[in-house]
Amino acid sequence: CVQVDLMGQVASESIGAKQISGVGGQVDFVRGASASKGGVSIMAMPSTVKGKISKIVPLLDEGAAVTTSRNDVDYIVTEYGVAALKGQTLRQRARNLIEIAHPDFRDALKEEYEKRFHQKY
């Protein structure tokens, strides 16, 4: 995963408009996992790029391709925990993702949450 936005959309093939890879079957694996008996889709990633850039962002970079839609992701995992997304409201998805973001970026993500949802975090 290159980026995951606060709604759970996953960009894995581009950084903004710059293509860096192909889909590589990610969507097939995610949907296959969800469709299997007792299966769930799990996206695992480090919370940052080299400790400097958060992979959990308010919005995907302009021009980024959505590789996996928010409707196909059950869980996002970082070294800070697991964010359950399936069946959650948009507000709860955002809260769950902020909780597994790198601590250095959580305050900024909380500010974006408040702007988007017009309520205190």
Language-model features: locations:
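Conserved phosphate- and dinucleotide-binding cores of soluble alpha/beta proteins
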Residues: C1-Y121
